[in-house]
Structure formats: structure tokens, C-alpha cells
């Protein structure tokens, strides 16, 4: 009988929940700012966890500086995880900046720019969108 979710998926979901709570309540570092854990990928042997994070940067904070500050807390977060989650081996945590949101916004802006350029060119030539379909 197959399981609905594999063990690695269940462990990654649990790690995501626990890390989110720990970052919110236990890590007191103003350099990190507001952090969101978007995904966790756990290796098949559960030895490594790649944690994808995004930041809401305020003032002079950058994602790079926030990520560097967060990486300083990797050993202590791993130790706290070991106390909260009972696994034979607590995964080594590796934080990675998740730029999918930024890339998605960039792609959306590119599409919007192209659509606006097409509309402007059509207006300059005196054609309408319904004329395009008739040709």
C-alpha cells in the first residue's frame, strides 16, 4: 500500500513549520528582518535540508545581508530543531534566497510592457484589435 506522502515530504513540511516558529519567536537578530520560509527540500537520507527564504527588507537591509545574518544562526537553529523534532539525524540546514517572487514580478512587468507597446503601436497606426483578427 503506497503512502500519500513520502517521508522526506513529511519531514520537510515539519521542518518548515518548526523553523518558521523558531525564526519568529526565538531568533532575535535585527539584521534578519521579516523572513518567510517558502519551501524546504530535504535530501533522501534526511542529512541535508535546503531552506528557501524570502525577506521583507526595510531601510538599508538587502536580501544578501539578511541571508548572511541568517546563515550565522544555522548551527543554533539545527540544535534547536534537534530538540523539537525526534529524528535519528538532525538535517544540516542550508539557507538559500528564493528569488522566484522577484523573477515572477519581473516577468509580469515584461509582459505588461510588451502588451502596452503593442497597444500603442496599434493606436498610432489607426488599427483596432478587432481589425487584427480580420486579416
UniProtKB/Swiss-Prot annotation:
Transmembrane segments: none annotated. The keyword Cytoplasm applies. This is Ribosome-binding factor A. It is found in: Cytoplasm. One of its GO terms (molecular function) is ribosomal small subunit binding. The keyword Signal does not apply. Belongs to the RbfA family. NCBIfam families: rbfA. It comes from Aliivibrio fischeri (strain MJ11).
Amino acid at each position: 500500500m503506497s503512502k500519500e506522502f513520502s517521508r522526506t515530504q513529511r519531514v520537510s513540511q515539519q521542518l518548515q513549520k518548526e523553523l518558521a516558529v523558531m525564526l519568529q519567536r526565538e531568533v532575535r537578530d535585527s539584521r534578519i528582518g521579516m523572513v518567510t520560509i517558502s519551501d524546504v527540500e530535504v535530501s533522501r537520507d534526511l542529512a541535508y535540508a535546503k531552506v528557501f527564504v524570502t525577506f521583507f527588507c526595510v531601510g538599508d537591509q538587502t536580501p544578501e545581508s539578511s541571508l548572511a545574518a541568517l546563515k550565522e544562526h544555522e548551527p543554533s537553529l539545527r540544535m534547536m530543531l534537534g530538540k523539537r523534532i525526534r529524528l535519528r539525524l538532525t538535517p544540516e540546514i542550508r539557507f538559500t534566497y528564493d528569488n522566484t517572487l522577484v523573477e515572477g514580478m519581473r516577468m509580469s512587468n515584461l509582459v505588461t510592457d510588451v502588451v502596452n507597446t503593442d497597444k500603442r503601436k496599434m493606436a498610432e497606426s489607426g488599427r483596432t484589435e478587432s481589425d487584427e483578427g480580420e486579416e
